[in-house]
Amino acid sequence: MKRILLEGIRFAVIAGAAVAAVYLLILVHAEQLFERDTAVSVAAAVHLQPHNAVYLDRLASWQSEDRQNLLRRSVQADPFNYDAWIRLGLIAEMQDGDNVSAEKYYRKAAEVNHMFLPKWTLTNFYFRQQRPDDFFHWTRETLAITPYASDPVFAQMWLMSQDENTLNEAIPNRPRVLLQYAWYLAGNKHFESIPHTVDRLVAAVGKDDPGKWGRDDLLAASLDRMLAGGYQAPALRVWSSLKDAGWLEEPQPDAQHPLTNGDFHVRFYRHGFDWVPLENSGTRVEQYPEAPAVRLSLYGDEAEKITLLQQYVAVTPGKRYKLTWQAQGDDLSNPSGLAWRLHPITRLKGSAGAEITSDDLLSGTPSWTFAAPYGDAFLLALEYTRPLGNTRGRGSVTLKSVAMNQQ
């Protein structure tokens, strides 16, 4: 009796192993067919494995006439197949015009998968449907986790609404997203919205290295775009945020003292409200923060009119200012051809006041009193113009300090 029982167990084990071996062969063959990736081979793989969601998904791509049915079978086999739920939603929305079913499928995808694609799919759906509340809800969800550049999301946001509070509420306190948004705003000339975004950015970054978060590139270029476009007030607010957060060493300019880093002690930031030395053939501009001083050299083969050094200054139109400087000419003839020029910039092209120019840098009193012309922003430039009747300048000037004060 015991022997018969053992033989029965042995037979069952052998039979089970044989069934498992056959099933394994079926699995291997089905995978081989699937990997051939043809309409016939994938259909054969599904025939062998009718409940394999991956195979059903792929077959749906080959058999457009039966796509919807195959995708339904796929989500029945694997309810967590978010991609199939999304594809069902697209068929319902785009092909059948059934937005109710489409929304159900998209939401199911977001329910079973909490990553980027389902959230972004719902954001796009509600944008197409022009449903602002749902759109901004899923916009926030999308931006909270997106690993990608977010410009497409920002573009849809601005098309859906221009309300600043609504837009700001949709942006999460993720430094990466906040920096991308500030750059998007600058690129699309939404300059008035940048200061609030930068406030949030510096708060979110905290004590991390500001060089990693756009101080020297994206934010710097955004400042330059704002000022070049005549948006002095928002640029001042951004500068203040960066200064208060310790991202900048330069002082905060104001109407009384509109020029910064006039003693040249801080190494040039080269953006915003700090000095920008310009590279020109035949000239050289060198800063010596330890001196401190700036040395301007002309080699005799420079252009007849060039800008050597410039800074945006926060002057107020109609107010009187006095610019003073300390400069020493080294082997440069007098007149030197060097002079300060104030360039007004306006948002409305052609409406700026006239440019105004000081006397020669090395001639007479080292000061210039002027009334600021009309403008929305102002660029102070130290320019060289070859004096009439003279050869091109050759020599250098050491500039030790520059100051500007409202009178």
Language model regions located:
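Extracellular and organelle-lumenal recognition/adhesion modules and their flexible linkers in secreted
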Residues: 7-31, 148, 152, 173, ...
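N-terminal leader/linker segments that initiate helical-solenoid repeat arrays
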Residues: 7-71, 75, 82
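Structural signature of tandem alpha-helical TPR/SEL1-like repeats
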Residues: 32-43, 63-73, 94-108, 129-137, ...
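Conserved structural position within tetratricopeptide repeats
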Residues: 46-47, 72-76, 107-111, 144, ...
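Short coil turns that delineate tetratricopeptide repeat
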Residues: 47-51, 79, 113-114, 144-148, ...
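TPR alpha-solenoid repeat register
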Residues: 55, 84, 118-119, 152-153, ...
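Canonical tetratricopeptide repeat
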Residues: 58, 87, 121-122, 156
